Amino acid sequence: MRGSKPMTASALVLTTAWISLAASQALGATLTVKAGESIQAAVKRALPGDRIEVEPGLYKETVFIDKDGIELSGIVRGGQWPVLDGENKLNDGVLVSGHGVTIERLWVKRYKGNGIMTQGSNNYRIAYNVVEGPCFYAIFPQFGKNGLVTHNVAFGSEDAAIYVGMSDNVDVVHNQTYASIIGIESENSHDILIENNYVHDNVVGIATTMLPALPVKSSDRIIIRNNVVARNNMKNTAPPGAITAGAPPGLGILVLGTDHTTVEGNLIRDNDGVGVMVSETNFLVTTPDDRMDPFPDSTQVLRNVFLNNGSNPQGTLRDLLDIAGVK
């Protein structure tokens, strides 16, 4: 390769370590969980790098994964799924703190807090799941790096269906979200890609936000690209006092205080309030935070298709338009 340099001893050691780790994971055991058995019990037996396959059936439990390299994979057979049901009693469906974990092909429903959550987990993959409310967040990666959230269906959330919080380098691609307060949200995060999603029939379609009073004080380099953002006109039922309670229905894409945000190539249609709104944080949040810049800088809105937006703005959005003299 032109311009290449000999590998240093330290690089060779690191490369060898990665190869050894990959080989150990490839040789991991496969554990099978049958209907009536416990997924958590299988996680306890598993070693880092093992694969856990879950047969179709009903599982009423919370699954906590604190080991690295675990693959938790549902088996969908004849239209029958492995279903995790919180029965509106349990707080969380799947909680992950290990690195390199995969969660795929599970139907997760009726957890009061989060359907699938990673916290401090890096290099995770959340794919091909169905996460059904009522819940607060359907899919919630937080405090992690290098994540992939793809080909999921998430709906019925009391806040965001997919919520990427205080994270770096996460791709949210090829998902469908609906019937939630916000379809997809990136909060106080960096290098986030939101692409090729179908986001419809929420209060707000896609939001990238810079919120105060959080440990991460910046949000930068968010790309919202090639999504379909349609009919996000649902009545806002967020509880009083919640930040999202102030979000007016009909917002297609909201850029709230984040820097270097690119909104490009999206089809944005039939959102009654506005197709794309770029605003300082105070539009929704008035909590003071002297360590945070609430103003969005270097936003680009490029080559989007807008159809039939803005026909019935409501709430704070209508108030702003009235002040500006827009009828």
Regions found by a protein language model. Name each.
Residues M1-V13:
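Bacterial N-terminal signal peptides that target proteins for export
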Residues S10-A22:
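Bacterial N-terminal signal peptides
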Residues S24-A41, R45:
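Right-handed parallel beta-helix/beta-solenoid
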Residues A29-A35, R51, P56, G69-K112:
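Right-handed parallel beta-helix/beta-spiral solenoid domain characteristic of secreted/periplasmic
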Residues I39-R45, K60-K67, M117, S218, ...:
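Short, T/G/N/S-enriched strand-turn elements that build extracellular solenoid repeat scaffolds
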Residues Y59-I65, W81-V83, E87-G93, K112-T118, ...:
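Short glycine/acidic-rich loop motifs that flank beta-strands on beta-rich extracellular proteins
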Residues S73-I75, W81, H99-R110, N122-F136, ...:
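Right-handed parallel beta-helix
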Residues N196, L211, N226, A238-K327:
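Extracellular beta-rich repeat passengers
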